[in-house]
Every structure is written in structure tokens, then in C-alpha cells.
């Protein structure tokens, strides 16, 4: 992190002595630039191309050096469109990596990969900037104590709890509710924990980014009247951006989060939607740089790139960064190299199931596939652990019996199995929950359920105390008291119909 009062713009430092080169070749978003002998820029240095195109339009393109080719040439990847660039144009070596604004000035604002505001709310204070390329904290700086991060979402808190300062992956195919779950987590965490969040929109739809921004303004996470009171900074590099921007936007968001952790000594939440797009952009850049592809066409440096990002997301003695990352799973194949590489870094996984989404059970979190390293008796306590294990056993037995039920029907099951199926169906429905951010679609008010309430509810179902209630009473409710109240309402309605 550096204090730089002479910064001319967020992404680039003003230099007294300019090191100038010229464009030698343009291949889409990749530029080859020739520099004078002995004046070669370093890897990761930011280069700036300024000038006018053939119709007189102003051009200002920032690139990042990726390769030193020899013969005084470097190969750089552009962070914005290269339309209008021509061979021979002048290129300025800034002498430093891309640097972005950090600190309180970033809250409530939307930035691009260069740290430039894109929300039409005026300039941002850029006196304090930080380079996006940094090494991970030293081992001695890390904090190792284990504690649960309560989200207020029943299925998450009970079966795959999140670690404070950990990394959590949201896995699922297209359209099963990853982004809605992320929005709910931002909403709950801002309200329940009062924490600062940084949202990195990596290669996702611009419409979704806009929807999220509007949602945050409505919920008060972004305070329009007093922008400094906002609880989140947004960084976007969306689908329409060149691969260079999509590859680096995650680092821009992480750099902003690191400042809150290291300097302000805060607990920070870093949301990345979607980490797969970070890998995808790296794959595109790798091909453009002429590297031989690896398995399934991915870049050979996949593990290195993922590691350099993930190792910086950690808890130190100053504060913590808890990261929640949406992971798009191509063709729902968890063995694909991109999600498989991501798995290695995660403390918890929340797997979203298309089957549950088809049944209308939201959030469509798969209770048997989702895992957490925190679900151990010494961390969560015996009561929580035992309840979670019994819920999983009941659901697993129901899954095993489904083929028999499909062929022979429920009547052929033993009394014990019929009871297990009935309780499993109640549990399945009780794992659903109305979300605050989905109120506009469902008309049901959102519910935040504390961990103690969640455990109590599932214990009552497992003990058989609620065997007499209809299973639809457990669908889309908050705590167990709401389920019993809903059952009474259903009973009254059925009597009135008769």
C-alpha cells in the first residue's frame, strides 16, 4: 500500500521520467510493444496507450505486461477494448503494477478493474492506493482460531456451517440460485454482523450486476443519502469486457478487502461471482499468449493462478476476510478442472441441486453433497453435530428408499421406513426458507433463523413430536413455531372447505 498524492488517475501513477515504447503488433486484446534497449518494463507493469484513433476519438487503454519476448519487445494484455489502436502508437510504461483506490472512499461505489468509478457519482479520493499484485501474508501473521460464521440460513448453519475467515464455495449449474443466495448472504451479514463487504462481479451478466446494485440501495446496504455510511464496495468486470479485465477484477476486489483487513483491522466479506469466470478469462489470455493448453483446454498455469488469488484470502491477527465464491460448474460436472481446482482451497462447500430447484425447494442447497470442515463436535458442540448427523442419516435413508417407492409404492415399506420417509419429507421442506431478497418474487417476507432455533426445530422433527403435522406446513417457513402455526391454519382452511 502506498500514499501517492500525485496520482493522475486511479489505475496509473504519474511519473516524472516517462519510459516510452511503440505498438509493434495487435492481436485482439493482446499487444506487442517495442521499447528502447535497456528500458524494458517489468512483468505486471501497467502500460498506458493514449492518443486518437483514425476518426479523432480519444483513446486511453491500460495494459498489463505478461511476457518479455526478447528483441526489446513485451507482450501485454489490454484491460479494455483495443478498438482504434494502430501499430506505431506511443505506449507509456508507468513503472508500477495497476494500483486501485482503497479505504473508506470505496464504500458505496462501483469500480472497474482499474479502480475507476463507473457509477456516475463523481471522482473517488485516490490519495491512498494499493497495487493489485501482492504476496500472501506470511505464515507467522496468520490467525488460526476456529469460529462459526452464522448466516441465518437454516440449511447452511446446520449442515455445512461457514468458518469466520474461511473460504466457501457455492457450486451449481446455470439457474439454480447461486446469485440469489449471495445476495441473501450480503443482506443478512450487513444486518446481523454490521460488517464491510466487497463484491467482485467477475465475468457475469451486466443485468445481474445492475439488479444487485439496485437491491443494495433498496435494502440500505448502500446508503444513497450518505454514501460513506454504506457497507459494501462493488467491483465489476462483466461478460462483455476483454479477458484481461475479467482475469484481474478479482484481484482488484481482493486488494480493497485487504486494506479493510490490514489497515482498518476489520472483518471483511469478499464475494466473488463467479470464480469460474476468473479461470475462464485466464484460459482465454493463456491461449492468446500462445501457451499450450492443458486438460480440457484450460491453461497450464491453472493451479498457480488460483493459488495466488486464494492464498491472499485469509485471516490475520489484524482482521479476517471471509470469502464466499460462486462457482459455476460446467455441464454440472464437478470433476471439471476449474471447480476441482477451486475445491482444494475451500473450507466449506454449498452445493446447489437442480433436482431440489425442480421440486421448488429454495434455497436449493443439497444437504448431502454440501460439506464443511467446521462440522466437528469440538468446534460446533455435541448437540449441533448430533442433530446434523441425524438429519443427514434420515435424508440418506430416504434417498436409498426412493427407487423402491417408485416401483412398489409406500405401502410396501416397513412401518419404520414409512416413518423415516415421512420425517425426511418434513426435513426436506423445513430446509427451505423465504429470503429477504426474494420477497418481490414470492410475496413471502424473508426470515433470519438463528442457529439455536434451527437446531431446536430439527430436533423436534427427529424426535417425532411433529409427526402429526402435514408436510406442507414445513415448506418456506422460518423457525419451527411458524411451521406449527401454519399447520393450524391449514387445518382451519380444510375444515372451512368441507
Curated annotation (Swiss-Prot):
Query: Which SUPFAM superfamilies does this one have?
Result: C-terminal domain of alpha and beta subunits of F1 ATP synthase, N-terminal domain of alpha and beta subunits of F1 ATP synthase, P-loop containing nucleoside triphosphate hydrolases
Question: Its Enzyme Commission number?
Answer: 7.1.2.2
Q: What class of enzyme is it?
A: translocase
Cell compartments where the protein resides: Plastid, Chloroplast thylakoid membrane
Classification via InterPro entries: AAA+_ATPase, ATP-synt_VA_C, ATP_synth_F1_bsu, ATPase_a/bsu_AS, ATPase_alpha/beta_chains, ATPase_F1/V1/A1_a/bsu_N, ATPase_F1/V1/A1_a/bsu_N_sf, ATPase_F1/V1/A1_a/bsu_nucl-bd
Name of one Pfam family that matches: ATP-synt_VA_C
One cellular component (GO) term of this entry: proton-transporting ATP synthase complex
Complex formation: F-type ATPases have 2 components, CF(1) - the catalytic core - and CF(0) - the membrane proton channel. CF(1) has five subunits: alpha(3), beta(3), gamma(1), delta(1), epsilon(1). CF(0) has four main subunits: a(1), b(1), b'(1) and c(9-12).
The record, for NCBIfam families, names: atpD
Purpose: Produces ATP from ADP in the presence of a proton gradient across the membrane. The catalytic sites are hosted primarily by the beta subunits.
Name of the featured protein: ATP synthase subunit beta, chloroplastic
What organism does the UniProt record list as the source?
Platanus occidentalis
Its gene is atpB
Amino acid at each position: 500500500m502506498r500514499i501517492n498524492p500525485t496520482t493522475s488517475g486511479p489505475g496509473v501513477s504519474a511519473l516524472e521520467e516517462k519510459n516510452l515504447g511503440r505498438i509493434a503488433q495487435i492481436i485482439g486484446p493482446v499487444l506487442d510493444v517495442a521499447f528502447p534497449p535497456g528500458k524494458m518494463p517489468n512483468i505486471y507493469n501497467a502500460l498506458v496507450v493514449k492518443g486518437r484513433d483514425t476518426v479523432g476519438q480519444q483513446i486511453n487503454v491500460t495494459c498489463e505486461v505478461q511476457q518479455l519476448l526478447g528483441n526489446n519487445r513485451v507482450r501485454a494484455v489490454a484491460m479494455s477494448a483495443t478498438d482504434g489502436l494502430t501499430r506505431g502508437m506511443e505506449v507509456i510504461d508507468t513503472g508500477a503494477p495497476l494500483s486501485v483506490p482503497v479505504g473508506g472512499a470505496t464504500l458505496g461505489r462501483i469500480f472497474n478493474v482499474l479502480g475507476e468509478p463507473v457509477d456516475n457519482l463523481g471522482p473517488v479520493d485516490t490519495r491512498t492506493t494499493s497495487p493489485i499484485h501482492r504476496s500472501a501474508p506470511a505464515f507467522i501473521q496468520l490467525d488460526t482460531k476456529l469460529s462459526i460464521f452464522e448466516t441465518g440460513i437454516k440449511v447452511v448453519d446446520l449442515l455445512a456451517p461457514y468458518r469466520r475467515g474461511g473460504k466457501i464455495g457455492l457450486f451449481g449449474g446455470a439457474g439454480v440460485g447461486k446469485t440469489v443466495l449471495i445476495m441473501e448472504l450480503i443482506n443478512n451479514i450487513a444486518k446481523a454482523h454490521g460488517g464491510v463487504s466487497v463484491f467482485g462481479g467477475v465475468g457475469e451478466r451486466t443485468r445481474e450486476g445492475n439488479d444487485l446494485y439496485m437491491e443494495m440501495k433498496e435494502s440500505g446496504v448502500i446508503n444513497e443519502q450518505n454514501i460513506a455510511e454504506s457497507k459494501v464496495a462493488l467491483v465489476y468486470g462483466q461478460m462483455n469486457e476483454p479477458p484481461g479485465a475479467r482475469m484481474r477484477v478479482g484481484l482488484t476486489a481482493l486488494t480493497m478487502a485487504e486494506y479493510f483487513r490490514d489497515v482498518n483491522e476489520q472483518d471483511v466479506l469478499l464475494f466473488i461471482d463467479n470464480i469460474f469466470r476468473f479461470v475462464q478469462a485466464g484460459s482465454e489470455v493463456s491461449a492468446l499468449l500462445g501457451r499450450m493448453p492443458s486438460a480440457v483446454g484450460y491453461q497450464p498455469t491453472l493451479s498457480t493462478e488460483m493459488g495466488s488469488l486464494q492464498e491472499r484470502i485469509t485471516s490475520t491477527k489484524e482482521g479476517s476476510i471471509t470469502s464466499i465464491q460462486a462457482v459455476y460448474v460446467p455441464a454440472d460436472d464437478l470433476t471439471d478442472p476449474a471447480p476441482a481446482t477451486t475445491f482444494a482451497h475451500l473450507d466449506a462447500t454449498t452445493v446447489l441441486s437442480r433436482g431440489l430447484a425442480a421440486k421448488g425447494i429454495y434455497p436449493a442447497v443439497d444437504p448431502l453433497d454440501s460439506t464443511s470442515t467446521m462440522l466437528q463436535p469440538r468446534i460446533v458442540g455435541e448437540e449441533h453435530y448430533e442433530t446434523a448427523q441425524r438429519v443427514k442419516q434420515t435424508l440418506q435413508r430416504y434417498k436409498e428408499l426412493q427407487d423402491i417407492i417408485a416401483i412398489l409404492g409406500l405401502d410396501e415399506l416397513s412401518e419404520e421406513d414409512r416413518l423415516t420417509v415421512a420425517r425426511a419429507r418434513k426435513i426436506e421442506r423445513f430446509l427451505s426458507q423465504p429470503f429477504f431478497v426474494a420477497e418481490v418474487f414470492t410475496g413471502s417476507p424473508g426470515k433470519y433463523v438463528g442457529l439455536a432455533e434451527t437446531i431446536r426445530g430439527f430436533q423436534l422433527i427427529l424426535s417425532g413430536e411433529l409427526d402429526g403435522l402435514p408436510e406442507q406446513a414445513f415448506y418456506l417457513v422460518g423457525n419451527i413455531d411458524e411451521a406449527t402455526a401454519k399447520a393450524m391454519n391449514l387445518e382451519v382452511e380444510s375444515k372451512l372447505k368441507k
